[in-house]
């Protein structure tokens, strides 16, 4: 879509669920996006250094959002000592 100046403008940019890989539709009002900031040794957020997770309403409705967030954070190296049934 273009505006009157000829610039490309999108009204909606679809996201993918970080846990399942499904596309989050525009009418999925149960979805959420969580941004976790990376911090320095003093505990202050580093500007521009963050990790974004998007969880679909399907994952949240199944009650799997906390487990999915733990799994994703472990994969990205944010968590280390979380119980895992595969171990």
UniProtKB/Swiss-Prot annotation:
The keyword Hydrolase does not apply. PROSITE patterns: RIBOSOMAL_S21E (PS00996). Keywords: Cytoplasm, Ribonucleoprotein, Ribosomal protein, rRNA processing. One of its GO terms (cellular component) is cytosolic small ribosomal subunit. One of its GO terms (molecular function) is structural constituent of ribosome. Signal peptide: none annotated. It is found in: Cytoplasm. One of its GO terms (biological process) is endonucleolytic cleavage in ITS1 to separate SSU-rRNA from 5.8S rRNA and LSU-rRNA from tricistronic rRNA transcript (SSU-rRNA, 5.8S rRNA, LSU-rRNA). Its main location: cytoplasm. Component of the small ribosomal subunit (SSU). Mature N.crassa ribosomes consist of a small (40S) and a large (60S) subunit. The 40S small subunit contains 1 molecule of ribosomal RNA (18S rRNA) and at least 32 different proteins. The large 60S subunit contains 3 rRNA molecules (26S, 5.8S and 5S rRNA) and at least 42 different proteins. PANTHER family: 40S RIBOSOMAL PROTEIN S21 (PTHR10442). Belongs to the eukaryotic ribosomal protein eS21 family. This is Small ribosomal subunit protein eS21.
């Amino acid at each position: 879509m273009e505006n009157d100046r000829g610039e490309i403008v999108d009204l909606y940019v679809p996201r993918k669920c970080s846990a399942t890989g499904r596309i989050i539709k525009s009418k999925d009002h149960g979805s959420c996006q969580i941004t976790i900031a990376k911090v320095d040794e003093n505990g202050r957020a580093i500007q521009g250094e963050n990790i974004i997770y998007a969880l679909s309403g399907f994952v949240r409705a199944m009650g799997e959002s906390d487990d999915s967030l733990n799994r994703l954070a472990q994969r990205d190296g944010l968590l280390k000592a979380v119980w895992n049934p595969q171990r």
